[in-house]
């Protein structure tokens, strides 16, 4: 370890102890050496005993800086792991940091462009438009066509800082997991590994640009979502250049009402957008918090969303999509047995799970939800409660489903903030039913056959030869089978003969011994014993050798 990493490790330990986070570890799993070490750091006392655990964790992460703040934000979406109180505390974390020097920003941009800024841009604004833990945004005008653009550049040395903090997190998570045991519900090492994957993706701005281009192409003809244009030739690992947009923040409901936005239509389009991204395109924006979503200023009666920051995207397998759609339909049909079957069939929980116990657990959680009107039932809450229940049955964490759940909760919260009477089920049900019909109906079968036709057309000329080879192999197998069967029958015949001789010899020897003890005729007794011994020798010698068939 370097001196810098040792200092950072001490800073993390000091902050952890100052906020009493060690008190959150159950004492029954705390080993003696941990207690001894804690006692030796007597000057690092809990200075926030008056605060509850969730608030102390939030404040500690706020103090530890951007990487921990983003980790806390991610944890706030893992309501399958945390209580609602803790999740709400962590959701208050704000990813706001002071901007770094504009001279450093210029230097970083020019290093990526391999040219002075003035070669490509006019009116570069040194004062950043926005600043966050990973990157900073500046505005400019594109010299080639006069288009207004924004430049997003990574903070200096952010990669090294992130990797160092993630390494410390991973070590702490492994230690915590060793205390809690392999069967603990929290699985800290798994959570940190998920976070590592997410944040390392955000450190590659080129990947964000490619994600944005793909999402934009998926909605080119849409009246519901607009993704700003990416100038791909000016996009690199540490810098991206995109079209500058003008919109109303989706969280500013007063401004939306002031411009006469159709909030009911906007809320319904948000739900449709989610299901379209997930089920039609299998490529969904997984970071749709209000800071990344704007609403168009033009055509307020026919509003559309503007999506930013495509650094975190999600995809599902075809099986995941089908199981997910069936889960929702089974829930609203109150078919809890089917929900339990789906979790087992999908492999999300083990095949040896007690399906009746799982069904009952699902029913206990889901049935009370139907005490409220359908338009008040939250899809995200349903998914969350199902995941929480499945975790009790050792559900294997599915990172793609965690992203989906987080996105769904964002979309629902957003939709009901815009239009509290939003009926998610009525909006989503036709979409889900149509999608299921397309996947499992005659149309789906015809589509799969059509998709496979080129392959079978290519294989058709070889089909007669393959049939002949298989028939020949079948004949050979039949011959081999007959030979083995014949050998087996002969082996069994020998075994029966040997067993018969051995049993007969034993009977004769026993009878001869009895006659001898009863003073019977000597020749009869000795003759019986002698014959028995001869038969025993013959039986022993005729035993078949052990064979493997």
Curated annotation (Swiss-Prot):
ATP binds at residues 129-137, 152. The active site is at 287 (proton acceptor). GO terms for cellular component: plasma membrane. InterPro entries: ABC1_dom, Kinase-like_dom_sf, UbiB, UbiB_bact, UbiB_kinase. It is found in: Cell inner membrane. Its main location: membrane. CDD domains: UbiB. Keywords: ATP-binding, Cell inner membrane, Cell membrane, Kinase, Membrane, Nucleotide-binding, Transferase, Transmembrane, Transmembrane helix, Ubiquinone biosynthesis. Coiled coil: none annotated. It is an enzyme of class 2 (transferase). The chain crosses the membrane at residues 498-518, 520-540. The keyword ATP-binding applies. Belongs to the ABC1 family. UbiB subfamily. Is probably a protein kinase regulator of UbiI activity which is involved in aerobic coenzyme Q (ubiquinone) biosynthesis. This is Probable protein kinase UbiB. It comes from Shewanella piezotolerans (strain WP3 / JCM 13877). The gene is ubiB.
